[in-house]
Amino acid sequence: MGTIARYYAHVVLFLVATSVIFTVKKTEAGVPCAESCVWIPCTVTALLGCSCKDKVCYLNHVIAFEAKTMDEHHLLCQSHEDCYKKGSGNFCAPFFNHDVKYGWCFRAEFEGYLLKDFLKMQPRDILKISKAIAK
């Protein structure tokens, strides 16, 4: 009987420890995308909006929010001209959060225009599009 009780105690301890770990990770500011970019760039998480900073992949808006100058990352910008000057694109897209003072450069005109059109859309139009896609 004692071994079964110890087994359950270990299982409960494991579940409590993992729930604490995941709770802490969700509340941290600037949580990395759980990928390293020491030798290769962010690959899998790049599709989720992550870029390399200090050899760790971070979400793009976190990099832009924590930046003190535009020189901290090659894709940070405040205007389209900044993207041209840095050679990182031709369109500077702002983030939805107005507390983020820098935008993000896009290389292709097509991506920039799509994002620009999306940002101009009203929420009801976005819902119509998502309903049409779901059908």
Curated annotation (Swiss-Prot):
InterPro entries: Albumin_I_a, Cyclotide, Cyclotide_bracelet_CS, Cyclotide_sf. SUPFAM superfamilies: Cyclotides (SSF57038). It comes from the Eukaryota. Expressed in root, seed and nodule but not in flower, stem, shoot, leaf and pod. Residues 1-29 form the signal peptide. Disulfide bonds join 33-50, 37-52, 42-57. The keyword Disulfide bond applies. There is a cross-link at residues 30-60 (Cyclopeptide (Gly-Asn)). Keywords: Disulfide bond, Knottin, Plant defense, Signal. Probably participates in a plant defense mechanism. Belongs to the cyclotide family. Bracelet subfamily. The presence of a 'disulfide through disulfide knot' structurally defines this protein as a knottin. This is Cyclotide cter-B.
